[in-house]
Design a protein with these regions (language model features):
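Intracellular juxtamembrane helix-capping segments at the cytosolic ends
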Residues: 141-155, 350-363
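Interfacial helix-cap and linker-helix signal at transmembrane-aqueous boundaries
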Residues: 62-63, 94-95, 179-188, 273-274, ...
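Helix-loop-helix hairpin linking two adjacent transmembrane segments in secondary transporters
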Residues: 166, 170-217
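Extracytoplasmic gate region of multi-pass secondary transporters
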Residues: 55-59, 244-303
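Structural signature of the two symmetry-related core transmembrane helices
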Residues: 102-116, 312-327
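Hydrophobic core of transmembrane alpha-helices in multi-pass small-molecule transporters
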Residues: 46, 114, 126-142, 256, ...
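Extracytoplasmic
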Residues: 36-70, 88-91, 177-178, 264-270
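Conserved MFS/SLC helix-loop-helix module at the cytosolic interface between two early adjacent transmembrane helices
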Residues: 86-125, 305
Length: 437
């Protein structure tokens, strides 16, 4: 009888017959344990996603507290984006080595300590340091890309849908946390709110983190970790017939391009409505409408990607996002903008999760944590770049027309990369395979 280790090196190892482990592994994939883990990932992702949104809400209060100008007060947000980007890559690599449990525990602890430290900051530098290092780089970063990579190990038939559900946690965080933070700030001030959030997050997230203690099923049989069904014209060592780093760079560049385009409505819709004379409140309603339909789109696109693969899902989403951006150029009426905003949310929600699906389809599974994190980090950087770039274009032209056209140009670049990769791809979409005992 052949034996294999469980692969868990944190809480002890034990040997069991490989055939039994193989059977248990197949029972876990797409099974009850997988769906429970997905639910836990959605919940902890929603909680941990606060690190990306809270700094925006407290920015005016921080500016007033420390007596700095708006540019200096915006520094913590910029450092948050940089910290998140750097942290995602390192946390992804750590996840590939030891699994997601330890990164998630580290994230829960860092978020709690980070918010307490931010609430006790004596100056803007200390606040920015706590925000960038503890809250973003160590705290929130393992709760998006690395968490999605972990979820991908637990699903085969429903992998695309599962990845979309996991990614939705970031949307839920953006919907739920800002009004909660604002409510407590009104009554208790920003410092007490930050400290309270830190204590709350540690108390709630640490027990949740232990739901990820169990290693992913495929990690239990070492021979199966990287096993995939190969076709004669598909070589995972050369995705799309390119070097792995070149293929990764193209996917990352596509992520930047799509999100520069995506950022135009998401970041500037409120200001756009104000400039058109509709008021800030109408713009905020359109943003909420956009995010709500984005959740629907994200889930639906996950189901679609299970049927046609991540690349084709990206192609469809990119094309439809371009259509919605063009509609923004054509229509400027209030009712029309409500409709276009709903369509934009419905069209673009599935683009970001498709990158995680593409990575799992075309790269070795053992690299999932790192490569998924790089791809998703690129989308975050694209949002940051687009938000700034479209603002610069508005300042230059005194109109958002050129900014929308700029978004269309970046969207065309994303669409071109998707078409190029589809043309390079050969054979059926790969799927994770098991190794017979």
């Amino acid at each position: 009888m052949e034996y294999a280790s469980t692969g868990e090196d944190t809480f002890g190892t034990f040997n069991v017959p490989l055939s039994r482990r193989h059977f248990e592994m197949n029972q876990d994939i797409d099974g009850f344990a997988a769906w429970m883990r997905l639910g836990a990932a959605l919940l902890i992702g929603t909680l941990g996603g606060v690190g990306m949104w809270s700094v925006v809400v407290v920015l005016p209060a921080v500016q007033a507290e420390f007596g700095v100008d708006r540019g200096a007060a915006s520094l913590p947000y910029s450092l948050t984006m940089i910290g998140y980007a750097v942290g995602s890559v390192f946390m992804g690599r750590w996840t590939d080595r030891v699994g997601v449990f330890r990164p998630v525990v580290a994230g829960a602890l860092a978020l709690g300590l980070g918010y307490v430290a931010a609430g006790m900051a004596r100056n803007l530098f200390e606040f920015a340091l706590a925000q960038a290092v503890l809250i973003a780089a160590i705290g929130s970063s393992p709760l998006f890309g690395p968490l999605m990579a972990d979820v991908s190990w637990w699903f085969r038939r429903y992998r695309g849908f599962a990845l979309s559900v996991c990614a939705t946690g970031n949307y839920f965080a953006g919907t739920l946390w800002p009004p909660i933070i604002n409510y407590f700030m009104q009554d208790y001030g920003w410092r007490a709110t930050q400290i309270g959030m830190g204590i709350f997050l540690m108390i709630v997230m640490l027990p949740l983190a232990f739901l990820f203690r169990r290693p992913a099923p495929v990690q239990d049989a070492p021979a199966a970790v990287n096993a995939v069904v190969h076709t004669p014209d598909r070589d995972l060592s050369r995705p799309f017939g390119l070097s792995p780093n070149m293929a990764q760079a193209l996917i990352a560049f596509a992520g930047v391009a799509c999100c520069v385009a995506m950022s135009m409505p998401q970041v500037h819709i409120v200001a756009y409505c104000s400039d058109l004379g509709f008021g800030v409140a109408r713009g905020a309603e359109m943003l909420s409408l956009m995010m709500g339909f984005g959740i629907v789109s994200r889930l639906a696109s996950g189901y679609i990607s299970d049927k046609i693969g991540g690349l084709k899902t990206l192609l469809i989403g990119s094309f439809l996002q371009g259509v919605a951006l063009a509609l923004y150029v054509i229509f400027e009426g209030l009712n029309s903008l409500y409709v276009v905003s709903a369509l934009f949310g419905l069209f673009q929600g599935g683009i970001v999760p498709s990158y995680a699906m593409i990575v799992r389809e075309y790269f070795p599974a053992k690299e999932a944590g790192t490569r998924v994190s790089i791809a998703l980090t690129a989308t975050m950087l694209g949002m940051a770049l687009g938000g700034w770039l479209n603002g610069v274009i508005f300042d230059w032209t005194k109109s958002y027309d050129m900014a929308f056209l700029n978004g269309l140009a970046w969207n065309f670049l994303n669409l071109s990369i998707a078409v190029f990769l589809i043309m390079r791809a050969r054979g059926p979409t790969p799927r994770t395979a098991t190794v017979p005992a």
